[in-house]
């Protein structure tokens, strides 16, 4: 999917089924390396990143069957250096390192790929593994790691909150000798889901969802069954789609408690929000949104993966709104494309200032990453005229059937 035709002047109304969380499913798939037991994982989204992860596992010797629900047997792993042509495609491939080290005592992994969003160093991953007793050599863009015997439990104070590094250390520590404490750990729902999965296999992890996670190492893990949590970012994206178009939507098979900050901001913008056990209903009919001031922060703060969508919302809102990005560098690349569509946006350091206008205009725009792709498609849906969104190959990395789901709620999007 390289290019999309997006018809504008649409009000988006209806019902959407939310897919499983990419950010939980990817690490969970790589965590299967930790055990010889048979595993069944449900609610796996159909995404290119997921498909690449599965290819990586198969390359190592893992047996996998199924589609949305996968049956996985990692008992026959006999390769410890995944190929560069796959590693280079997804940043999540770094999560193979901890499980391979913990179970087999060795791993050789090329530096990973993925979205190019500013500086995303892997130092925190490597420092954590080193503290657990691993010897790591980094040469020619390749991580060569090994440990004699088992990894050793340790108190690890993270110098900054990192979801990725928290996952790496937590996974490696499950099979370490002794106890590990991760202080200043990330608290995201995906961390909780991964810990729940590992505990199902016999790990001993407590505190996931707080800033202090305690892992008591075990000798081995077994098999088990797990259901991946819903994708909170996909949910938030569809809620913004309805809010920006002055429509109404119900998102099904989602988890409202994972979106508290996003729902608060949508309510502040003027939306009527109702929630149930596994659904969220938003109504913005007949109302132009009010502008918002937002600052991204680690969970439970406002998610960085939602700031582009809210920049779109601010662009067509009443008043002046700001968004400050504190997690990643260079995550405002998409704003130049919104400006092409008539948005009035200024960048000042790590903050964008949006001067709301009533209507965007169609244009020929280019997406720079996953969330930018979704944002520009939504912008095309509400703009006047026909918008062509280029480089939408990013989209299938993190949104399952996004154009199809939007078309079901009133959009007119075609693949060119």
Curated annotation (Swiss-Prot):
Primary subcellular site in the record, as a coarse category: cytoplasm
Reaction(s) catalysed by this chain, per the record, are: phosphoenolpyruvate + UDP-N-acetyl-alpha-D-glucosamine = UDP-N-acetyl-3-O-(1-carboxyvinyl)-alpha-D-glucosamine + phosphate
Q: What is its EC number?
A: 2.5.1.7
Which residues are annotated with the PTM 2-(S-cysteinyl)pyruvic acid O-phosphothioketal? 115
What Gene3D superfamilies does this protein's entry cite? Enolpyruvate transferase domain
Q: Which UniProt keywords apply?
A: Cell cycle, Cell division, Cell shape, Cell wall biogenesis/degradation, Cytoplasm, Peptidoglycan synthesis, Pyruvate, Transferase
What Gene Ontology biological process does one annotation of this record name? cell wall organization
Q: Does the keyword Oxidoreductase apply?
A: no
Q: Which GO terms describe its cellular component?
A: cytoplasm
Report the active site residues. Answer: 115 (proton donor)
Question: Subcellular location, in the record's words?
Answer: Cytoplasm
Disulfide pairs here are none
| Broad enzyme group | transferase
Query: Which residues are noted in the entry as UDP-N-acetyl-alpha-D-glucosamine-binding?
Result: 91, 120-124, 305, 327
* UniProt GO molecular function: UDP-N-acetylglucosamine 1-carboxyvinyltransferase activity
UniProt-listed InterPro entries: Enolpyruvate_Tfrase_dom, Enolpyruvate_Tfrase_sf, MurA_subfamily, RNA3'P_cycl/enolpyr_Trfase_a/b, UDP_GlcNAc_COvinyl_MurA
One Pfam family this sequence matches: EPSP_synthase
Pathway participation = Cell wall biogenesis; peptidoglycan biosynthesis
Q: State the protein's name.
A: UDP-N-acetylglucosamine 1-carboxyvinyltransferase
Q: Taxonomically, what lineage is the organism?
A: Bacteria, Pseudomonadati, Pseudomonadota, Gammaproteobacteria, Enterobacterales
């Amino acid at each position: 999917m390289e290019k999309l035709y997006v018809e504008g002047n649409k009000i988006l109304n209806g019902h959407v089924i939310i897919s499983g969380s990419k950010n939980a499913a990817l690490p969970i798939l790589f965590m299967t390396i930790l055990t010889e037991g048979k595993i069944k994982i449900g609610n796996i989204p159909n995404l290119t990143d997921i498909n690449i992860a599965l290819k990586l596992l198969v390359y190592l010797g893992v047996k996998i069957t199924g589609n949305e629900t996968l049956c996985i047997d990692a008992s026959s792993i006999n390769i410890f250096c995944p190929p560069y042509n796959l590693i280079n495609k997804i940043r999540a491939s770094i999560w193979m390192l901890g499980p391979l080290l913990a179970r087999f005592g060795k791993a050789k992994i090329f530096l990973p790929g993925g979205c190019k969003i500013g500086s995303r160093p892997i130092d925190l991953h490597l420092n954590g593994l080193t503290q657990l007793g691993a010897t790591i050599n980094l040469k020619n863009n390749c991580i060569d790691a090994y440990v004699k015997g088992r990894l050793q439990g340790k108190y690890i104070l993270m110098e900054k909150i990192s979801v990725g590094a928290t996952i790496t250390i937590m996974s490696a520590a499950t099979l370490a000798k002794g106890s590990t404490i991760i202080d200043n750990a990330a608290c995201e729902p995906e961390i909780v889901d991964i810990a729940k999965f590992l505990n199902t296999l016999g790990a001993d992890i407590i505190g996931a969802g707080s800033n202090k996670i305690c892992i008591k190492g075990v000798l081995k893990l077994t098999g088990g069954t797990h259901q991946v949590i819903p994708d909170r970012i996909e949910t938030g994206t569809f809620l913004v789609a309805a809010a920006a178009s002055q429509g109404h939507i119900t998102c099904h098979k989602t988890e409202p408690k994972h979106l508290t900050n996003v729902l608060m901001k949508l309510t502040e913008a003027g939306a009527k929000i109702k929630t149930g056990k596994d659904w969220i209903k938003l109504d913005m009919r007949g109302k132009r949104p009010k502008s918002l001031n937002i600052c991204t922060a680690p969970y439970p703060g406002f998610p960085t993966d939602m700031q582009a969508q809210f920049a779109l919302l601010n662009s067509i809102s009443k008043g002046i709104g700001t968004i400050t990005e504190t997690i990643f560098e260079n995550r405002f690349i998409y704003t130049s494309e919104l400006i092409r569509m008539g948005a009035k946006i200024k960048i000042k350091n790590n903050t964008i200032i949006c001067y709301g206008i009533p209507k965007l205009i169609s244009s020929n725009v280019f997406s720079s990453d996953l969330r930018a792709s979704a944002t520009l498609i939504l912008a095309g849906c509400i703009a006047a005229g026909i918008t062509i969104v280029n480089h939408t190959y990013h989209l299938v990395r993190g949104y399952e059937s996004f154009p199809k789901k939007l078309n079901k709620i009133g959009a007119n999007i075609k693949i060119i």
